[in-house]
């Protein structure tokens, strides 16, 4: 049995909450953090805006239609990074085993905690109180014996909540959950599972491992483990992101020249994610999967780091043109990614050397 004590801390509507904290006029108002424009996407939405159906990564024009009276605020990433640093300093008071996932969430391994608090639940409660008292922001937290369960737990009582999944209660907790609550289970996989009568995590647990592996390959093994509350992945402090990518599965297979809008949307999503993590990338990657499940990748490394959403989009579309196939070939998945990251500090120093 896993005896670790893992906490997942997730700042509630982080960017929007920072804006509301710093401007009293925004408190209680629906706030959408996004650039205005036809191709922009929502970076964050306050809970007041979410009541109208606004969600992160939604096209900004759609968000404006759903909530026309919302206040649109352009993102201020330097300010968010500064607040995120303050949050991390609070987390590090309790353990050195802190794995940031983004500016607004992190995993902590508090199996041994610096403050000698008697339980992981007490550590999580203290962290939330310190964030509230020192930064005037709300955070949700989940406590469990592994990262997978802790993440589900932190979502359970949002916003501004704390939830604990005890080891002997994990299976009972997971059993009735819909399959889409499992990481990696999107619309397409949910549909495939539904077609074979699988709708809940408990249904997955009742399937033989061989059936899951036959249907979903290596991820079938992962589903088998998750349905049993198993996750051996360690908390990895300072683990660098190797790549940032996004992909989409079409409802029906499409021709190559019908992928423009999807590539642009994915490029916007990837660019926003790289900005959120303050990452500087040198390589742009395009991924395509044919209707016959053949995977094609094309990449390009410009002479200087990728500097804008427009550059990312132009290069991704150009990479598509390098795909030489029968014009009648159809595709089921397209993806856009950034990789070959550089340290922003080193990059800035190198730029200065050559000015």
Task: Name each model-derived stretch.
Residues 8, 181, 189-333, 338-354:
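DNA-contacting surface of Y-family translesion DNA polymerases
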């Amino acid at each position: 049995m896993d005896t670790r004590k893992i906490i997942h801390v997730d700042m509630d509507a982080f960017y929007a909450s920072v804006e509301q904290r710093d401007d009293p006029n925004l408190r209680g108002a629906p706030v959408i953090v996004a650039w205005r424009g036809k191709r922009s996407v929502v970076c964050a939405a306050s809970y007041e805006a979410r009541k109208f159906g606004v969600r992160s990564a939604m096209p900004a024009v759609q968000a404006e239609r759903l909530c026309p009276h919302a206040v649109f605020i352009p993102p201020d990433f330097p300010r968010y990074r500064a607040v995120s640093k303050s949050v991390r300093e609070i987390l590090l008071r309790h353990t050195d085993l802190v794995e940031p996932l983004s500016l607004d969430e992190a995993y902590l391994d508090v199996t041994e905690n610096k403050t000698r608090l008697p339980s992981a639940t007490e550590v999580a409660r203290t962290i939330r109180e310190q964030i509230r008292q020192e930064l005037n922001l709300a955070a949700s937290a989940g406590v469990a014996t592994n990262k997978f369960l802790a993440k589900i737990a932190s979502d359970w009582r949002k916003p501004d909540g704390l939830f604990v999944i005890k080891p002997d209660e994990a299976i009972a907790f997971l059993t009735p959950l819909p399959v889409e609550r499992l990481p990696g289970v999107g619309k397409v996989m949910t549909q495939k599972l539904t077609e074979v009568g699988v709708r809940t995590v408990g249904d997955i647990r009742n399937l033989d491992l061989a059936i899951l592996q036959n249907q979903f390959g290596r991820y079938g093994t992962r589903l088998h483990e998750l349905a049993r509350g198993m996750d051996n992945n360690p908390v990895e402090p300072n683990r660098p992101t190797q790549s940032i990518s996004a992909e989409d599965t079409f409802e029906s297979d499409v021709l190559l020249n019908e992928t423009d809008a999807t590539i642009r949307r994915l490029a916007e999503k990837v660019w926003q994610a790289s900005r959120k993590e303050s990452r500087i990338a040198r390589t742009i990657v395009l991924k395509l999967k044919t209707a016959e499940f053949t995977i094609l990748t094309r990449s390009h490394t410009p002479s200087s780091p990728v500097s804008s959403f427009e550059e990312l989009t132009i290069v991704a579309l150009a990479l598509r043109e390098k795909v030489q196939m029968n014009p009648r070939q159809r595709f089921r998945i397209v993806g856009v990614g950034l990789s070959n990251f550089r340290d922003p500090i080193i990059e800035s120093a190198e730029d200065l050397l050559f000015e």
